[in-house]
Amino acid sequence: VPARRAGVIDNPYLEWIGADIRCDPWAYAAPGWPERAAEMAYRDAYLSHRRNGVYGAMFFAAAISAAFVLEDPLDAVGIGLTEIPAECRLAKDIRWALGKTKSLSGWQEARALVDGRFQGMHAVHTNNNACLTVFGLALGCLLYTSPSPRDS
């Protein structure tokens, strides 16, 4: 079987997070160069994934690469979005999550929002996990940048 076709044969996991999990080294190999990180992630992800499974790896590799040179992790998310098709489902879902971050009250609300939007989607699908990551970064920024009760 040619390598370019191997990923689609008897593979129901084409849009799951397997390629996302493998994308970190591409970002580390190209810190501050998200285009290159996304390109390397694409080459790797295409062996086992398609569509949003590939786009997720490209998005995360680019975002991690950008995070090396940016202060705000959500700015890195924005850079990651520039490396995937603007109208793919994953990009639309990430933009949805970004739009919810300003009013997010905590992890329970984040989980409820994702569960509501992605009803019936498997827990290890790329899209719902990307949105949870965006929410985690947003909530983490709030915790990191808000004054600690101990500072009072």
What are these regions (language model features)?
Residues 144-151:
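Conserved small/polar residues in nucleotide/adenosyl-binding loops
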Residues 1-71, 75-87, 96-98, 116-120, ...:
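Amphipathic alpha-helical interface segments
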